[in-house]
């Protein structure tokens, strides 16, 4: 029996592009081509289709909501939906009504140009002024944003701020050959970076059905965008991503800024290879920007931090990463990443107030960080499925994510208790040595506790 075109699937996939459909039907003149077209249609249909059979066939849906994009089960038991490639999102995003539009925003990545930023129910995307079509490659499903940061722009005489949004699979350092093999040739989204001044939006620059609500928080661009990003991600079902800001109380450089000398710098200059950039030591990890590729190294993926090429005026930092990413075999994560030519004056601040505070100099603590991350990851999917992430808890009043956090902390406490029970004073010399070490650990624990309290206060402040 001759191979037949899967017309139903093809029409479902290309219903908005009848020209493509007609070209396929015209060129399916051999069994090999027919099979190829059917395989392409099946692949795209699986990427766009709904996992819920009650939604009906895709051909009966006028638009495909991003919430229906399938997730991919992973070997460790939880689902991790990779951010859809840019090409699959443009047509889908264009069907979503724009709720809020911010005009003339300076986008610096993935493209450097002024665009209008549009918030819809499921997307954040850029479009050229006076057009209604999203810009290819600058369309971001709100559910797939994994990290969001609010950072001052270095070396500017006037205060400006960068918003950095990192979709899944966009921020870890990958080997050069990984891009060609990842996702069957479909590339993940790049980070989104846009810049705003420390001023209020201009009249007429904020439009859309939600502009009336936005007016109440439009004292500055920052207050407006904090509100817009947080509420949009929550409305789209993204309850895990928090907007994180740099804080000079947590880390700041001792070097004086020539452009704004009265303001503490929350960054240090650092090279990655021949590219100059800036390192930000943040509550959730280390970010290097703002030249491509922007990197973010989450604390729970850092195995250890060490120092090399320590000279009189500069030194290098080497960050060793946990490259074990279940289900992401096609993404080759670099094992070590080095940042060079850091000012020697900042060595103490980086080592004492950040690296040691987070236990990054101690390889033994890497397993604890990894276990905590995996525990939270494993609970995320069931939490989303049960609609617990919106803040509704069980009988104990906790959400699933909060419960995972408590379990992780309890696990670490149990390990510490076991170590104390197994402790044998031994000889006098051993006892003295371990006693001194215990004192240092107590100091570290107190510092870590204070730091975590500040971190929680900061996150609550951003959400409010």
UniProtKB/Swiss-Prot annotation:
Which is one GO molecular function term here?
A: nucleosome binding
Where is this chain's protein located in or outside the cell?
Nucleus; Chromosome
The answer to keyword Metal-binding applying to this record is no
Presence of the UniProt keyword Nucleus in the record: yes
Main subcellular localization, coarse class?
Answer: nucleus
Q: Which GO terms describe its cellular component?
A: chromosome; nucleus
* Region of interest (Disordered), ranges: 382-464
Alphabetized SUPFAM superfamilies for the sequence = PH domain-like
| Database matches in Gene3D superfamilies | 2.30.29.120, Pleckstrin-homology domain (PH domain)/Phosphotyrosine-binding domain (PTB) (2.30.29.30)
Q: Point out the signal peptide segment.
A: none
What sections of the protein cross the membrane? none
Q: Where is the composition biased (Acidic residues)?
A: 412-464
Keywords noted in UniProt = Chaperone, Chromosome, DNA-binding, Nucleus, Transcription, Transcription regulation
* Task of the protein: Histones H3 and H4 chaperone involved in the nucleosome formation and heterochromatin silencing. Required for the deposition of H3K56ac-carrying H3-H4 complex onto newly-replicated DNA. Plays a role in the transcriptional regulation of the cell-cycle dependent histone genes by creating a repressive structure at the core histone gene promoter.
Q: How does it assemble?
A: Interacts with histones H3 and H4.
Q: Which PANTHER family match?
A: FACT COMPLEX SUBUNIT SSRP1, HISTONE CHAPERONE RTT106
The similarity annotation says: Belongs to the RTT106 family.
Q: Spell out the protein name for this chain.
A: Histone chaperone RTT106
Per the UniProt entry, what species is this protein from, by scientific name? Chaetomium globosum (strain ATCC 6205 / CBS 148.51 / DSM 1962 / NBRC 6347 / NRRL 1970) (Soil fungus)
């Amino acid at each position: 029996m001759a191979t037949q075109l899967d017309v139903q699937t093809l029409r479902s996939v290309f219903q908005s592009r009848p020209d493509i459909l007609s070209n396929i039907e015209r060129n399916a003149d051999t069994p090999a081509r027919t099979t190829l077209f059917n395989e392409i249609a099946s692949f795209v249909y699986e990427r766009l289709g709904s996992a819920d059979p009650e939604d009906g066939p895709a051909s009966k849906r006028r638009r495909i909501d991003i919430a229906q994009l399938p997730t991919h089960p992973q070997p460790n038991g939880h689902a991790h939906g990779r951010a859809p490639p840019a090409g699959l999102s443009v047509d889908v995003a264009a069907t979503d009504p724009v709720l809020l539009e911010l005009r003339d925003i300076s986008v610096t990545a993935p493209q450097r140009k002024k665009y209008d930023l549009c918030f819809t129910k499921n997307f954040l995307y850029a479009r050229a002024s006076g057009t209604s079509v999203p810009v290819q490659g600058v369309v971001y499903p709100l559910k797939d944003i994994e990290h969001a940061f609010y950072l001052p722009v270095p070396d500017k005489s006037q205060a400006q701020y960068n918003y950095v949004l990192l979709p899944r699979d966009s921020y870890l350092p990958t080997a050069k050959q990984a891009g060609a093999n990842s996702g069957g040739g479909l590339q993940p989204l790049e980070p989104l970076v846009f810049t705003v001044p420390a001023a209020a939006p201009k009249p007429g620059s904020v439009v859309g059905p939600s502009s009336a609500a936005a007016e109440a928080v439009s004292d500055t661009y920052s207050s407006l965008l904090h509100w817009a990003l947080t509420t949009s991600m929550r409305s789209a079902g993204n309850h895990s991503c928090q907007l994180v800001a740099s804080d000079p109380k947590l880390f700041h450089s001792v070097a004086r800024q020539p452009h704004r000398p009265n303001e503490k710098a929350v960054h240090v200059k650092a090279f990655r290879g021949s590219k100059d950039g800036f390192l930000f030591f943040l509550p959730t990890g280390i970010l290097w920007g703002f030249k491509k590729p922007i990197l973010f190294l989450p604390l729970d993926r850092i195995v250890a931090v060490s120092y090399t090429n320590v000279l009189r005026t500069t030194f290098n930092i080497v960050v060793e990463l946990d490259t074990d990413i279940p289900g992401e075999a096609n993404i080759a994560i670099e094992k070590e990443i080095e940042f060079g030519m850091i000012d020697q004056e900042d060595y103490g601040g980086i080592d004492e107030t950040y690296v040691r505070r987070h236990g990054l100099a101690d390889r033994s603590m890497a397993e604890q960080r990894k276990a905590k991350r995996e525990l939270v990851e494993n609970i995320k999917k069931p939490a989303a499925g049960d609609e617990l992430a919106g803040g509704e808890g069980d009988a104990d009043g906790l959400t699933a994510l909060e419960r995972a956090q408590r379990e992780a902390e309890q696990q670490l406490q149990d390990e510490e208790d076991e170590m104390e029970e197994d402790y044998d004073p031994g000889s006098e010399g051993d006892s003295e040595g371990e006693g001194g070490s215990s004192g240092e650990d107590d100091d570290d624990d107190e510092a870590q506790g204070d730091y975590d309290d500040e971190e929680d206060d900061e996150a609550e402040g951003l959400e409010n």
